[in-house]
């Protein structure tokens, strides 16, 4: 249900490659990674429902939630393990994170 809006339907192609992620200012653990490029490979994006759960946004002709947070769980649309320096830094901060 929440994966009902596919990027393929809107853009007629998958979102593959590098794109910037802008993290919410109220989460200072990740905020200074805003504007860094992360690697994306997907055809869908997640409709967050509750906007308070959005940790980061990416623009691909329109903004979409690319990182979500709820309690002690973080989910990303991008692949931090494939995102070189920015991804390593994101993973490091995730490991050090204390919700």
What are the residue ranges of the model-derived segments?
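Single conserved hydrophobic/aromatic residue that forms the stacking wall/gate
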Residues: 1-11
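Amide-donor transfer/coupling interface in amidating biosynthetic enzymes
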Residues: 9-99
